[in-house]
């Protein structure tokens, strides 16, 4: 089940043309193909669907859906049970620190981020006492090498994912004085058992979830 508009895992190699490729290969194998359009959303209000139609056609709200409200450039004032979505992780980390500084309870969905970020730090050094300035110089040299390699191989989505990881680690580096401190900050932000009043999440992790108020 899927369509050309659902390649939300592009950073993992998802292809928006995957369904088309399946269809082509099945037809070449003399298989009969049937299409069953799923163009009605039972989850989104009409105003949200109307906004989505600017980018995705043939997508409709259920006739009983509430009208809802889309506010462009709304003030960032999320409250309890609100959801904050972003395509990448780094802006979520910044938003997390911003909300915490305001005394609000927030969490970033996806504890699986912890291992990847910690490993990216440990890949550079196992010395937890190393200062952040020295660490950052070594980290950036490694980043630039691997980023250039991905670009040369035309792996754009993977390069963007690497950029996002770099931006995340940059934020944590600014919050610490040593490598050990960076790792502690990563674990503090992501190892909170997904508990809090305001949920921050990347779009792909939030698939299937809903909230009355969503900031994008």
Specify the residue positions occupied by each region the protein language model found:
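Short amphipathic beta-strand/extended segments with alternating polar/hydrophobic composition
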Residues: 74-76, 169
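Terminal export/targeting leaders at protein ends
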Residues: 78-80
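Core RecA-like ATPase module of SF1/SF2 helicases and allied nucleic-acid translocases
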Residues: 86-216
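Conserved helicase motor core of SF1/SF2 NTP-dependent helicases
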Residues: 1-72, 83-102, 107-119, 195-199, ...
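Short, intrinsically disordered/low-complexity patches at protein termini
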Residues: 72-74, 131
């Amino acid at each position: 089940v899927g369509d050309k508009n659902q390649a939300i895992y592009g950073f993992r190699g998802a292809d928006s043309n995957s369904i088309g490729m399946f269809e082509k290969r099945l037809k070449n194998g003399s298989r009969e193909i049937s299409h069953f359009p799923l163009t009605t959303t039972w989850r989104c209000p009409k105003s949200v669907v109307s906004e989505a139609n600017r980018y995705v056609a043939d997508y409709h709200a259920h006739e009983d859906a509430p009208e809802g409200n889309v506010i462009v450039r709304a003030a960032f004032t999320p409250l309890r049970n609100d959801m904050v979505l972003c395509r990448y992780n780094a802006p979520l980390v910044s938003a997390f620190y911003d909300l915490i500084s305001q005394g609000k309870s927030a969490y970033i969905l996806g504890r699986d981020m912890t291992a990847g970020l910690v490993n990216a730090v440990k890949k550079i050094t196992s010395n937890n006492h190393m200062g952040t300035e020295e660490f950052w110089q070594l980290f950036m040299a490694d980043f630039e090498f691997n980023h250039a390699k991905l670009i040369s191989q035309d792996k754009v989505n993977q390069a963007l994912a690497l950029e996002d990881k770099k931006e995340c680690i940059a934020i944590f580096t600014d919050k610490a004085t040593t490598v050990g401190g960076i790792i502690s900050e990563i674990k503090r932000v992501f190892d909170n058992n997904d508990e809090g009043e305001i949920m921050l999440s990347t779009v792909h992790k939030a698939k299937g979830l809903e909230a009355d108020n969503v900031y994008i």
